[in-house]
Swiss-Prot record:
Protein name listed in UniProt: Histidine--tRNA ligase
Family: Belongs to the class-II aminoacyl-tRNA synthetase family.
Keyword NAD set for record: no
Family matches, as InterPro entries: aa-tRNA-synth_II, aa-tRNA-synth_II/BPL/LPL, Anticodon-bd, Anticodon-bd_dom_sf, His-tRNA-ligase, HisRS-like_core, HisRS/HisZ, HisRS_anticodon
Source species of the chain: Desulfitobacterium hafniense (strain Y51)
């Protein structure tokens, strides 16, 4: 039996990888424009980082982490998210001692043991940004505007930004008390997970996808009902700034997010029709997280987006479109001497920066031209023993179906000129 890839993972093959590369280039471009710098953290961390940072009551820590003991008997976890790692790096490398704010972004794989379904994988990829060192509403508005701008450039349609304030340690206890009082008469009807959340973190019950729990929480007190003056003013200013930036948003009082570290601002970006999950970005403010992982009190805000979901949404928005040709020129060589000469030509063109290819299988003229079509090459250059003897080469435009004979000595100059005229 052939060995297969682990469940919940995927092979990104040629033709698909190019879509990922394009998305990554768009991400890096907009991050440069907004003044964010890339950070790369380890794929595995000490398990305690996520227990303390993400929260021991979360589904991620309780059910979804890939955790193991290494050969030194240390508990290690493959990172399930990026924010805790960035905060750890911020503290460990004393970034808090330099100019603030620190504006960072990351791109990389994350790991969660989830039931694989449409839009969800056990190894998945996230792009995220984190801003540390400033607590102003304008920073919240900037990170939301960044992702809104990115999705607009990617051509995504039917987008919705949902925003909420989940309060702070000063005002959240009052909401917790009111929510527990509301849920207490039907506590035993809650799902098993929500019953365990009732005492420690009842706010998470509002995030439960169980239909019974959703029905029970209809009409429950929201965090907006009990915000302190500071949180209320922060949320009001955020909405004003989003409107000024022409970001279309909706206040969603039931939005609480699934991680314990959020304070004040929480937000999601949703899109329709990409499978089981419609959220393609989520984030919020985490002013206590840096201190939780051993640093000084430091405000922070960020978001993460699932790149697989964004690519799926982009595919739906654009439809099935043919990508750019993998090769600009395919050299069709027939015969040993022609293959040697053709290989030398292709090598010189590649060194100058032209995407060029040559058949490696010694196939027939017909088979090589079919291969050139498959990679959507713009041109095929045909060189056989007869052409070599005459000192010519045939250049065929595969887009127009036209061809010309060129002196072999002039070929590279001519094809390079056409390459530049095509905007390369």
């Amino acid at each position: 039996m052939a060995i297969q890839r682990p469940k919940g993972t995927q092979d990104l093959l040629p033709g698909v990888v190019e879509q990922w590369q394009d998305l990554e280039e768009q991400i890096r471009k907009i991050c440069r424009e907004y003044g964010y710098q890339e950070i790369r953290t380890p794929i595995f961390e000490a398990t305690e980082l996520f227990q303390r940072g993400v929260g021991e009551t979360t589904d991620i820590v309780n059910k979804e982490m890939y955790t193991f003991l290494d050969k030194g008997d240390r508990s290690i976890t493959l990172r399930p998210e990026g924010t805790a790692s960035v905060c750890r790096a911020y503290v460990e490398n004393k970034l808090h001692g330099g100019p603030q704010p620190v504006k960072l972004y990351y791109i990389g794989p994350m790991f969660r043991y989830e039931r694989p379904q449409s839009g969800r994988f056990r190894q998945f990829h996230q792009f995220g940004v984190e801003v540390l060192g400033v607590d102003k509403p304008m920073v919240d508005a900037e990170v939301i505007t960044l992702v809104w701008d990115l999705y607009s450039r990617l051509g995504l349609k039917g987008l919705e930004v949902h925003v909420n304030s989940v309060g702070c340690p000063s005002c959240r206890p009052e909401h917790k008390k009111k929510l527990q009082e509301f849920l207490a008469p039907r506590q035993e009807q809650l799902c098993k997970d929500c019953q365990s959340r009732f005492e420690k973190n009842p706010l998470r019950i509002l995030d439960c996808k169980n239909p019974t729990c959703q029905e029970i929480t209809q009409g429950a007190p929201t965090t907006l009902d009990t915000l302190c003056e500071e949180c209320a003013e922060h949320f009001k200013e955020l909405q004003s700034l989003l409107s000024a930036a022409e970001v279309v948003y909706k206040v969603n009082p039931r939005l609480v997010r699934g991680l314990d570290y959020y304070r004040k601002t929480a937000f999601e970006v949703l899109v329709e029709d990409i499978g089981a999950q419609s959220a393609i970005c989520g984030g919020g403010r985490y002013d206590g997280l840096v201190q939780e992982v051993g640093g000084p009190p430091t405000p922070g805000i960020g978001f993460a987006m699932g790149m697989e979901r964004v690519l799926a949404a982009r595919k739906l928005a654009q439809g099935e479109q043919e990508g750019e040709g993998k090769e600009y020129l395919m050299l069709v060589a027939l015969g040993d001497q022609a293959q040697r000469e053709g290989f030398a030509i292709v090598s010189r063109l590649r060194k100058q920066g032209m995407p060029a290819g040559i058949d490696l299988l010694g196939r027939s003229l017909k088979a090589q031209l079919k291969a050139a079509d498959r990679v959507q090459a713009h041109y095929a250059a045909i060189l056989g023993e007869e052409e070599l003897h005459k000192g010519i080469i045939i250049l065929r435009d595969l887009r127009l179906g036209e061809q010309v004979e060129l002196p072999l000595q002039d070929f590279e100059e001519v094809v390079w000129k056409r390459y530049k005229e095509d905007g390369n």
